[in-house]
Every structure is written in C-alpha cells, then in structure tokens.
Amino acid sequence: MEMGVPGLKAAQVGVDAEIKALQDGVASIYPNINGTSDVKAEASRFIKAFIDIDIAPEGCVPVTGSMQGTYASFLVCGQCTPGKDTILFIDPGFPVQKQQITVMGYRYESFDVYEYRGEKLRDILEQYLSKGNIAAMIYSNPNNPAWFCLTEEELKIIGDMANKYDTIVIEDLAYFAMDFRKPLGKPFEAPFQATVARYTDNYILQISGSKAFSYAGQRIGVTAISDKLYHRAYPGLTQRYGGGTFGTVYILSLIHI
C-alpha cells in the first residue's frame, strides 16, 4: 500500500466499461479538450455522493493520474500571485511531489504535522503563512505513509488559515474513504469523506483511481477545483497568459500541453 499498489483486482465495472468504450471506437478520436462531458458529470456526482460537496462538472478535470493533477496544480498556483512562489508541505506526504517542485524550479517548505496536532496546527501555519510567500499548501488525508487522519478541527484550522492568507489548499485524496473506522462507502449517506472544502473555497481536490478502484495501471484521476477558485482571475495568470481564470488556465494552458 505504501507504493500505491493494493494488489487487488481492478473494479470489474471499470474493466467492462473500458472494453465497451474501446469496442465503440473511443480510441480513434481525441477527447474534448476540457475533458469528456460524461466523465466530468459523473466526477461531480461522485464528489457529491461521497464527500457531500458541490463542484460543477466544469471544475472536475480528468487527469492522467493524480501525479499529473498535482504537477499542474503546483505550476498554476505558483504563477497566480507575484511573490508567492513556495509550496508548503504538511508532512508526511508523497516524496515525488517535492521532486515535482524541484523540477519546475519552485521552492518548498515543510513541517512534520506529528508535533502540531490540534490547535498547535494553527500556530505553525501562522508561522509559515504570515511570511507571505506561500502559494499553496498540500497534505494527504487519509495519510500515507503514517496512516492517520486529520480531524475536523484540524481541517477547519487549515481552511481558516487559507482564508486568512488567501492561500490555495491542495487536498490529496489518494486514499479516498480509507478511514475504515467509519462506513464511508454509502453514496449520498452520512458519514462522508472529511475535507477542507467545508471550510474554504480556496481548494483543489486530487482524486485518484489507483487505490480507490484498484485501477493504477491506467493512470486515471480527477482534479476537482472549487467553483470559486475555477472562476477566479489572478494578476500573475493575466500577465503570463493574457487573461483567463484559474480553471481555464489549468485546463487550456497546462493539461492540454
């Protein structure tokens, strides 16, 4: 599991649907640049069913696994506001994400959340965010490799601090609904997967098919951008791309290329 390979057979419904799609000729055409409409609609519905959060289909972006989703997210976040060029990692997390930051020439800072649980989390976030250089912060919840879950109190603290310092939160949900202390697998019924999205509009969710559906080989995932963030224009993006919003830049200028 630490390597993201549960060793379970891929969900049969996915295998059957993929076979049918190939037989119907999907391999012969390029998908819509914004993402296949059916996939976007079902991703939005999935998020409502299991997280109880409303995100419009336009903000549910199919990606080649969460690896591509986080890479593009880091890249856009670091271009939004001049002076905000650093990503804050709430560790432990996925080491490859730090390598992504290194590849794109950004900076990152990090701290181990083990020493800052509960209200202590607010103090350490204040210490980092008050410097004004943090473009986004990222964490994994449920967490790999430490196998703990952030509490609702801690998620609210992260959301509150994101609002206070206008910082984007990237929530890595690779191990979606794997807090097995709760029955999280019933669609449209509480309890739901915990999320920072209840406490801020400055969020991006990374949802991977690798673990949730044991579909690692196909590298599928969805980056879900909040409605408010999707439609927000940033000075840095306007200067670099001549216009557009966070969401349109993410899709047309990053994912498409």
Task: Write out the residue ranges for each language-model feature.
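Short coil/turn segments
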Residues: 32-35, 239-247
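Alpha-helical elements of Rossmann-like donor-binding domains used by nucleotide-donor carbohydrate transfer enzymes
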Residues: 13, 17, 42, 123-124, ...
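Active-site PLP attachment segment
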Residues: 193-233, 245-248
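Conserved small/polar residues in nucleotide/adenosyl-binding loops
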Residues: 255-257
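Conserved core of the PLP fold type I
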Residues: 26-165, 170, 176-200, 204
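N-terminal "arm"/small-domain region of PLP-dependent enzymes with the aminotransferase-like
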Residues: 1-31, 49, 167
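Short catalytic/ligand-binding loop motif for oxyanion handling, primarily in non-cytosolic enzymes
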Residues: 7-12, 145-148, 177-179, 213-216, ...
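Short aromatic-enriched loop/helix-cap "lid" or pocket-rim segments at secondary-structure transitions
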Residues: 11-15, 102, 180-184, 216-219
